[in-house]
Structures are given as C-alpha cells and as structure tokens.
Regions:
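Single conserved hydrophobic/aromatic residue that forms the stacking wall/gate
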Residues: 174-183
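Thiamine diphosphate
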Residues: 66-144
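Alpha-helical scaffold segments in soluble metabolic enzymes
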Residues: 44-52, 95, 99, 122-125, ...
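Short, charged low-complexity linear segments at domain edges
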Residues: 2-21
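Glycine-rich anion/phosphate-binding loop at the beta-strand->alpha-helix junction
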Residues: 141-157
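Catalytic-loop motifs flanking and including active-site residues across diverse enzymes
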Residues: 38, 42, 89-93, 171
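Active-site glycine-rich loop that binds ribose-phosphate moieties when present
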Residues: 118, 158-173
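Active-site diphosphate/adenylate-binding microenvironment
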Residues: 15, 23-86
Length: 183
C-alpha cells in the first residue's frame, strides 16, 4: 500500500480545540479502502471524538489486527503510536502495551472476522480482564480483504456479491428452535 500524505495547509480560520489542534491534526493518510464499506465513517467518527475530547494525538496508542480494519488506523491520528498485530491477537497485545505504559490512551480497532472468529477468545478475555481501552469492532459481515467470504457475524440468509446465500448452521445456536427454521 502506498502511503499518501494529506497536504498540511491550515487555513487561519480553522476552528481549534482547547489544545490548539485543528480537526486536520487528528487525520492520517488518505484512505485506500473501498468506497462505501463504512470503515471510513468509523475513522471520521474517531477523528471527531478525539478532536472534541481534546485528546493529544501523541498520547494515543492505536492497535489493530488483520483485515480491512487493520488499515483504518493509518487514516486517523497520524501523530499517534500505532501497531498492527497478527490475526485475532490485538486484544492481548493491547493488554501488554497497557500494562507496560499506563499513561497512554489505548484504542483497539478490529474487524468482525478478527474479533468474532480467530480472535474471539482474545476478545472475551480482554472484556473479562476489564482492560482500560476502547475496543471498536468494524462489522461488515465479510472477510473483505479476501474478497467477501461470509464472516462469523454474517446474517443467515444474506447473499454475497456473487449471489451465494449464507447457509451457516451456527444460527441454530441462537435463533432457531429447529433446523428447518434456519435459512
């Protein structure tokens, strides 16, 4: 992936927060994600929240797993600390970083495949431990980087871009009294 920096021009009339930062100071690189996937909207909300909460970008550590969500930390808080972990292990790495340096604000970004499949145990234990962090799961229902296979959070009966229907029988665990009801 090519790193494309945004221009650093700051108009003198741009509003600033209590720290003197503009909204642009909380942005990162230009996004290369697919248009309309929703991850850019989440990044925009993170930028807005950090601006409004007057968080110094250098005090934020952002961690991610693997998948489309792993790319999103590049697009916000360009002056913060960042680390991409191996698939499903972001909560454990974030826990270790938090134990090593409690002065930072920890933000974990993970996808539905990363959190609800291979990393579900890591996710559950981070919740159980009560780690001081913000954990954002970007749920788009597919493994987007590998071309759209259904993830663990895909709705039963949903269709892929190629028209394949999700017949995942795991929906029996939480929605249907009999196998015939699960489409």
């Amino acid at each position: 992936m090519t790193y494309i920096a945004k221009p650093k021009f700051h108009h003198p009339a741009l509003p600033t927060n209590a720290l003197g930062f503009t909204h642009r100071d909380y942005e990162g690189a230009i996004s290369t994600l697919c248009a309309g996937c929703g991850h850019d909207s989440i990044s925009a909300a993170i930028i807005q929240a950090c601006f409004e909460l007057d968080l110094p970008p250098h005090r934020v550590a952002k961690l991610s797993g693997i998948g489309c969500s792993s790319k999103t930390p590049t697009y916000f808080l360009g002056s913060s600390h960042g680390f991409n972990t191996v698939h499903g292990r972001m909560p454990s790495v974030l826990t270790g970083a938090n134990l090593a340096n409690r002065d930072l604000i920890y933000l974990g970004v993970s996808g539905d495949g990363d959190s609800a499949s291979i990393g579900f145990g890591q996710f559950a234990h981070a919740i159980r431990r009560g780690v001081n962090m913000v954990y954002i799961v970007e749920n788009n229902g597919v493994y987007g980087l590998t071309k759209g296979q259904f993830s663990a959070t895909s709705d039963p009966g949903s269709k892929s871009k190629r028209g394949v229907v999700n017949h995942d029988q795991s929906c029996l665990l939480y929605t249907s009294p009999s196998p015939r009801d699960c489409s």
